[in-house]
Amino acid sequence: MKVTLPAFEKARVLVLGDVMLDRYWVGPTGRISPEAPVPVVKINQIEDRPGGAANVALNIATLGGQVQLAGLVGDDETAKALTLGVQTLGVEPQWLVVNDKPTITKLRVLSRNQQLIRLDFEEEFDSASSQALFKQSEAMLDNVDVLVLSDYAKGAIADPRAFIAKARAKGVTVLVDPKGSDFARYHGASLITPNMSEFEAVVGPVKDEADLIEKARQLIKTHEFSAMLVTRSEKGMTLITADEPELHIPTVAREVYDVTGAGDTVISALATSLGAGSTLAQACAIANTAAGVVVGKLGTSTVSRIELIGALASHQGESGFGVVSEDQLAYAMEQARLRGERVVMTNGCFDILHAGHVSYLKQAKALGDRLIVAVNSDASVKRLKGDGRPVNQVDRRMAVLAGLAAVDWVVPFCEDTPERIITRLLPDALVKGGDYKVEDIAGGAQVIAAGGKVEVLGFEDGVSTTSIIQNIMARQ
């Protein structure tokens, strides 16, 4: 299945559930305590990261989605640290403060990238607090397309059935990351995402693939779920619906470094993809890729759109060169700069490629290690050149350019000038051919402000697309 990323910024998601603070104490260890047979860790680094439902919200924000977050916290310093953590990515949380309970905290002690111990500071919230949270959050359902219930069995989602029904009645897709052995609590959800151990806690041991599918479909029927996605560690994921063939997606993780928060990443990628218009199958494939990225990181982490683009390109066998999207190009440029390569960019219509173009592009490539050619769309060329142009459609123009040895990447743009795309990409050098003045080149000021250079190269005299067209017309 060919996977393409949707416009994540279109997704509007409400995340409601058990929020917590993941705190890390990190330091070296070189001796055993004389008091007990345990290592002594000299702490030299302390880091706080949003966890649980808060990590789901951060993952959605990192991908570019619009996200609202609701959860239960205590009246303490930990709540302030958690608030600060989610605000770093523009998420304004809607907490319900429970004065007699602490904000849930998971403290992990690490040394040499290994977790030595985890200490949990928590008390389960009561059902009254949970129902108050649901009531406080009802109005938020009017402004979202997807609801994520992130359940860690800490009390924030005591009985969500009425809230799920209200969300579905408003046309909101409801995703649940479940906990515990009672899936009846999530009756009517659109999609539920148990891992294998959570699934078997409900249905008992699974003998084989057929048994898994049968038991999943029974749960779907009993609890009126639309679908179930069972995450299966090294075996990937399996998507089951009531009456369609199951879809198995193999794992894409190259290295498993830390599984902390992997489930959060899965459901956040699902929510953002579905909210942006992906099909369920596409959303599951995107979530699978995101999980493969995040398990290669230490601790509770997020996955960016650029990381997803790189992972998808790698798994789908794409070279990273030739005709690319803007997102693919942004990732490719990032990788090129990590290799110490200088990136040059130029732009134009390139309607009928001729010797003057080829000579110019060779000169441009000589100014760096990699050359980007941004190409005007068909509509843009028509606005600039008039009726009858372009002679060649943009796909054909880009294919010819991509075949030149001097050109590394070709990307289309639809505006009359390339200022927007240049401002986004900010190449090390921006090149234009002809008699332009540097100060008149679109995007030049932005490149210079970022520390880059802008240069003007000459075109070969007497050679142009217009003259070629005129010569052809004269011979007819």
From Swiss-Prot:
Keywords (A to Z) from UniProt: ATP-binding, Carbohydrate metabolism, Kinase, Multifunctional enzyme, Nucleotide-binding, Nucleotidyltransferase, Transferase
Pfam families: CTP_transf_like, PfkB
Any one GO cellular component localisation term in the record: cytosol
Keyword Nucleotide-binding appears in the UniProt entry: yes
Record field: catalytic activity: D-glycero-beta-D-manno-heptose 7-phosphate + ATP = D-glycero-beta-D-manno-heptose 1,7-bisphosphate + ADP + H(+); D-glycero-beta-D-manno-heptose 1-phosphate + ATP + H(+) = ADP-D-glycero-beta-D-manno-heptose + diphosphate
Keyword match Nucleotidyltransferase: yes
Region of interest (Cytidylyltransferase), residue spans: 345-476
SUPFAM superfamilies: Nucleotidylyl transferase, Ribokinase-like
Spans annotated as Ribokinase: 1-319
Pathway: Nucleotide-sugar biosynthesis; ADP-L-glycero-beta-D-manno-heptose biosynthesis; ADP-L-glycero-beta-D-manno-heptose from D-glycero-beta-D-manno-heptose 7-phosphate: step 1/4; Nucleotide-sugar biosynthesis; ADP-L-glycero-beta-D-manno-heptose biosynthesis; ADP-L-glycero-beta-D-manno-heptose from D-glycero-beta-D-manno-heptose 7-phosphate: step 3/4
Residue positions of the active site: D264
Biological processes per GO annotation: ADP-L-glycero-beta-D-manno-heptose biosynthetic process
Top class in the EC scheme: transferase
Function summary: Catalyzes the ADP transfer from ATP to D-glycero-beta-D-manno-heptose 1-phosphate, yielding ADP-D-glycero-beta-D-manno-heptose.
Subunit details: Homodimer.
Family: In the N-terminal section; belongs to the carbohydrate kinase PfkB family.
Name of the protein described by the UniProt record: Bifunctional protein HldE
Native organism: Shewanella denitrificans (strain OS217 / ATCC BAA-1090 / DSM 15013)
